[in-house]
UniProtKB/Swiss-Prot annotation:
It comes from the Eukaryota. It is found in: Mitochondrion outer membrane; Cytoplasm. One of its GO terms (cellular component) is mitochondrial outer membrane. SUPFAM superfamilies: Actin-like ATPase domain. This is Glycerol kinase 2. GO terms for biological process: flagellated sperm motility; glycerol catabolic process; glycerol-3-phosphate metabolic process; sperm mitochondrial sheath assembly; spermatogenesis. Its EC number is 2.7.1.30. Gene3D superfamilies: 3.30.420.40. Disruption phenotype: Male mice are infertile due to dysfunctional spermatozoa, which exhibit unregulated ATP production, disordered mitochondrial sheath formation, abnormal mitochondrial morphology, and defective sperm tail. Spermatozoa cannot transit the uterotubal junction due to reduced motility leading to male infertility. Spermatids exhibit abnormal arrangement of crescent-like mitochondria, which causes a disorganization of the mitochondrial sheath. Pathway: Polyol metabolism; glycerol degradation via glycerol kinase pathway; sn-glycerol 3-phosphate from glycerol: step 1/1. The lineage of its organism: Eukaryota, Metazoa, Chordata, Craniata, Vertebrata. Testis-specific.
Length: 554
């Protein structure tokens, strides 16, 4: 029998999307931005102690190779030659920390995940040794001293794990976030693997100077981290090395972005003032501030958005996080038990079309930006005899939208550029009631890409546009038009403001329920790690083990 004829699909670009709960490999047509095929593998997490979250770096690596192999098989099934794949991009969960032996290629400990809380005492110790300038860390990194970021995780490893201490002493240790681990392994590992990261991941370590775009010696000295174990910092779009094994051996890895930056690129937010919001377990809002490094006065983080080429300028962003988005739906299902599947919330909310004066403040572990109030706890208020589960479901969806409104108001104040619309992605955007509510509460249009894989698309765009690959043009006139679903506000601005002001009254009532106590006495230590009352949403035990609702995972 004659072999079936293989077809040319034009230049294709692959994207590894390595998230907290799963790994995916997606293949795009670089001329149309269409998704050609994909494969996903679920991952396990380990919880050795309360508040600890770990993953096996080898399992993560294996999942990447499995996803690539299965996606290539799917291409073959439709007679597409895998030689059409010209480049691979990597998008990854940020901050998660790996240390490995450069001579054996073995991890020296499990990956310590971004939401791990074990470093609270480490943060307290470091806080006490901050120089006279209380903004010493934030002024260089845009970040507060927190358990969230990689430097304190690495400091804990060096303080507590003798195998890592010994490897550092003997010059065998390599440090990296997940992108570094994957790229090193995929480009050869012990046989010449490239030890690198990109600026969007480096800036989340708390060791990287976001002004000079280099590892900062003062920061490394402060955290007592040897600079010799750090990866080389590259742009988000350049050839780092070639795949040395697997179905795509010889294909260049030429794009690398932290997941939220990848979503920003995939949403094509290339202009100052453009913002995207990813709705998953929580919400991650990034606003492009252009080539200006804007420091927030309203509790937002300053971060690097992207640097799409060695000689291209760096773009900055303000980032705000909402802890409870999809997580509130999970709570309604698992704790409140008024639904059995997440999809039921939309149906319940549609039945009534209103909360009937019921407001839900999901401050399960305190309030976040712009309040930063650890004493708050979740409340449902405005209940009457008429209130039923449909109204509570509606109020839960409204809560996600009100929290987003507060973050975007903070961004508008920091940037001085009111948003004309909000671009959205993530699993919760499939909830049409939620999207309409968001437009009503923001009183600006909410724009959703019909193609939901924006994180993967951003990584693919960066890889395809790299010098030496050049199969994906990022020039405005060449960017593919992506179909958008648009939600326009359907209520008057005055009604929106009344509902929002009532929400803020409910927020005030949620405050002062608990007193932060000494964590050494066994009380909840979530907030002890952040100076001046500032804490990061990732330090939430509630989120540990929560299944990611988003297509773009942290």
């Amino acid at each position: 029998m004659a072999a079936s004829k293989q077809t040319s699909a034009g230049p294709l670009v692959g994207a590894v999307v390595q998230g907290t709960n799963s790994t995916r490999f997606l293949v795009f047509n670089s001329k149309t931005a269409e998704l050609v095929c994909s494969h996903q593998v679920e991952l396990t997490q380990e919880y050795p102690k309360e508040g600890w979250v770990e993953q096996d770096p080898k399992e993560i690596l294996k999942s990447v190779y499995e996803c690539i192999a299965k996606a290539c098989e799917k291409l073959a099934e439709v007679n597409i030659d895998i030689s059409n794949i010209k480049a691979i991009g990597v998008s990854n969960q940020r901050e998660t920390t790996v240390v490995w032996d450069k001579f054996t290629g073995d991890p020296l400990y499990n990956a310590v995940v971004w939401l791990d809380l074990r470093t609270q005492s480490t943060v307290e110790t470091l806080t006490k040794k901050i120089p006279g300038n209380s903004n010493f860390v934030k002024s260089k990194t845009g970040l507060p001293l927190s358990t969230y970021f990689s430097a304190v995780k690495l400091r804990w490893m060096l303080d507590n794990l003798r195998p890592i201490q010994k490897a550092v002493e003997e010059g065998r240790a390599m440090f990296g976030t997940i992108d570094s681990w994957l790229i090193w392994c995929m480009t050869g590992g012990v046989n010449g693997g490239i030890h690198c990261t990109d600026v969007t991941n480096a800036c989340r370590t708390m060791l990287f100077n976001i002004h000079s775009l280099e590892w900062d010696k003062d920061l490394c000295d402060f955290f007592e981290i040897p600079m010799s174990i750090l990866p080389n910092v590259c742009s988000s779009s350049e050839i780092y090395g070639l795949m040395t094994s697997g179905a795509l051996e010889g294909v260049p890895i030429s794009g690398c972005l932290g997941d939220q930056s990848a979503a920003l690129v995939g949403q094509m937010c290339f202009h100052e003032g453009q913002a995207k919001n990813t709705y998953g377990t929580g919400c991650f809002l990034l606003c492009n501030t252009g080539q200006k490094c804007v420091f927030s006065e309203h509790g937002l983080l300053t971060t690097l958005a992207y640097k799409l080429g060695k000689n291209k300028p760096v773009f900055y962003a303000l980032e705000g996080s909402v802890a409870i988005a999809g997580a509130v739906i999970r709570w309604l299902r698992d704790n409140f038990e008024i639904i059995t599947t997440s999809g039921e919330v939309e149906n319940l909310a549609r039945e009534v079309g209103t909360s009937y004066g019921c407001y839900f403040v999901p401050a399960f572990s305190g309030l976040y930006a712009p309040y930063w109030e650890p004493s708050a706890r979740g409340i449902i208020c405005g209940l009457t005899q008429f209130t039923n589960k449909c109204h509570i479901a509606f109020a839960a969806l409204e809560a996600v939208c009100f929290q987003t409104r507060e973050i975007l108001d903070a961004m508008n104040r920091d940037c001085g550029i009111p948003l004309s619309h909000l671009q959205v992605d993530g699993g919760m955007t499939n909830n049409r009631i939620l999207m309409q509510l968001q437009a009503d509460i923001l009183h600006i249009p909410v724009v959703k890409s019909v193609m939901p894989e924006t994180t993967a698309l951003g990584a693919a765009m960066a890889a395809g546009a790299a010098e030496g690959v050049n199969v994906w043009s990022l020039e405005p006139e060449d960017l593919s038009t992506i179909l958008m679903e648009r939600y326009e506000p359907q209520i008057q601005a005055t009604e929106s403001e009344i509902r929002f002001s009532t929400w803020k009254r409910a927020v005030m009532k949620s405050m002062g329920w608990v007193t932060a106590k000494d964590p050494e006495n066994g009380d909840n230590p979530v907030f002890s790690c952040l100076p001046l009352g500032f804490f990061i949403v990732s330090s939430m035990t509630l989120l540990i083990g929560a299944r990611c609702v988003s297509t773009a995972e942290e």
